[in-house]
């Protein structure tokens, strides 16, 4: 299916008859024990337990194999590991490749729990972490060490949405520490708007909770990797007991079928809102990768095939607690909630000092309150009207 366009791939990926048993969708196979008809059948399953053969529930069932196959087809990987959430996918992908004395180099705009895992957990294991500016490009060589084992990217960056120059970073890393494992949190692009492995990245990680599930009703993480990393990532995850239930795997596979049309709507609506915000007199800056002038926009334009619905903007004013509560509490369509990627529109606020506190060795260049939006599938004119009413509450 690699020669087919994305929408066709999304509809068909992982839907072989082996997994559907003649139905349209993959079967939901819930199992812990899987029965062998003979000693020889057990031996065969044991030999092939890591290659999509039914062996034991923790290795997966037909439901899991269908999703894993789909993810490999969509992201061009040699294998896919499923995790109970995105944070588990990040932590276990890193753990699979590091040992005492290693160094991890991570963007300082990574998701806060990813940073915390490195600073609070890896530090106890004798692994050091340092941080780089998301727009550093080829100058990342200044931060590489002989013991750098993992270089961890996230593009766009969490909250402030900077886009990396990935080709420059990958080339620089390969020139200095060619054996380092390069990983990326690819959740914003849903693994399909930015084909990470095509750019020389080794492991593409997602909180599939977000766009792949698409309905805010299940939690799951994925890590798709190249052949070089597959066995080590797979076996580490197995030994760490990482798995998801069959129903969650099924829900995620089902979400893939509508991902293309949903992403197009997220792109269209979020960009329209971003353009409207960019002209608003109370807005200092809009951070949307698809909007000219946003940090790294030229890299988004070169390397991505579309946009999702998550972005942020900065108010000219820093709201006090009372003003912020009045602003956030009275939206009719935007709900306050963590996560994103579902059909619904969401809003959260961050004060500049909070962003500064979670930017290790980094600086922020704004002083107003930052608002993060996820633009859902509602009518965009209704969303703009709701935001406009919010601005009227800021005096």
Curated annotation (Swiss-Prot):
- Effect of inactivating the gene: Disruption of the gene increases the amounts of L-cysteine and L-cystine produced after 72 hours of cultivation.
Which GO CC terms are listed, alphabetically? cytoplasm; protein-containing complex
Q: What is its main location?
A: cytoplasm
Q: Which GO terms describe its biological process?
A: L-cysteine catabolic process to pyruvate; methionine biosynthetic process; protein homotetramerization; transsulfuration
Q: Which reaction does it catalyse?
A: L,L-cystathionine + H2O = L-homocysteine + pyruvate + NH4(+); L-cysteine + H2O = hydrogen sulfide + pyruvate + NH4(+) + H(+); an S-substituted L-cysteine + H2O = a thiol + pyruvate + NH4(+)
Q: What does the record say about pH dependence?
A: Optimum pH is 8.0-9.0.
- Cofactor requirements of the protein: pyridoxal 5'-phosphate
Per UniProt, which keywords does this protein have?
Amino-acid biosynthesis, Cytoplasm, Lyase, Methionine biosynthesis, Pyridoxal phosphate
Whom does it interact with, and what assembly results?
Answer: Homotetramer; dimer of dimers.
Function in brief: Primarily catalyzes the cleavage of cystathionine to homocysteine, pyruvate and ammonia during methionine biosynthesis. Also exhibits cysteine desulfhydrase activity, producing sulfide from cysteine. In addition, under certain growth conditions, exhibits significant alanine racemase coactivity.
Q: Which family does it belong to?
A: Belongs to the trans-sulfuration enzymes family.
This protein's name:
Cystathionine beta-lyase MetC
């Amino acid at each position: 299916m690699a020669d087919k366009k994305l929408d066709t791939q999304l509809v068909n990926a992982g839907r072989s008859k082996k997994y559907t048993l003649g139905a349209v969708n993959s079967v939901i196979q819930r199992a812990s024990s899987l029965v062998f008809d003979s000693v020889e059948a057990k031996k065969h399953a044991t030999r092939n337990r890591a290659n999509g053969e039914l062996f034991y529930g923790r290795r997966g069932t037909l439901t899991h194999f269908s999703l894993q196959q789909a993810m490999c087809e969509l992201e061009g990987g040699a294998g896919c590991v499923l995790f109970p959430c995105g944070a588990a996918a990040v932590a276990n992908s890193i753990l699979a490749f590091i040992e005492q004395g290693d160094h991890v180099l991570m963007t300082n705009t990574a998701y806060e729990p990813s940073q915390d895992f490195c600073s609070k957990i890896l530090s106890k294991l004798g692994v050091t972490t340092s941080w780089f500016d998301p727009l550093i490009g080829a100058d990342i060589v200044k931060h590489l060490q002989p013991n750098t084992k993992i270089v961890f990217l996230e593009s766009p960056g969490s909250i402030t949405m900077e886009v990396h120059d990935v080709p420059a970073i990958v080339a620089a890393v390969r020139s200095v520490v060619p054996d380092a494992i390069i990983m990326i949190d690819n959740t914003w692009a849903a693994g399909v708007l930015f084909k990470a492995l095509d750019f020389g990245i080794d492991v593409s990680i997602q909180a599939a909770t977000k766009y792949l599930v698409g309905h805010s009703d299940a939690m799951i993480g994925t890590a798709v990797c190249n052949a070089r990393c597959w066995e080590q990532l797979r076996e580490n995850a197995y030994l760490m007991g990482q798995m998801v239930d069959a129903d969650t795997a099924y829900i995620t596979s089902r979400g893939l079928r509508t991902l293309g049309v949903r992403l197009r709507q997220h792109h269209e609506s979020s960009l329209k809102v971003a353009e409207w915000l960019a002209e608003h007199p109370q807005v200092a800056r809009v951070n949307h990768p698809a909007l000219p002038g946003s940090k790294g926009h030229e890299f988004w334009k070169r390397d991505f095939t579309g946009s999702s619905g998550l972005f942020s903007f900065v108010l000219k004013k820093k709201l006090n607690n009372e003003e912020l509560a009045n602003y956030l509490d009275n939206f009719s369509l935007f709900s306050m909630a963590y996560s994103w990627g579902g059909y619904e529109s969401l809003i959260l606020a961050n004060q500049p000092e909070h962003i500064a506190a979670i930017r290790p060795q980094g600086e922020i260049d704004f002083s107003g309150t930052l608002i993060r939006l996820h633009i859902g599938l509602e009518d965009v004119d209704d969303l703009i009207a709701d935001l406009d009413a919010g601005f009227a509450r800021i005096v």
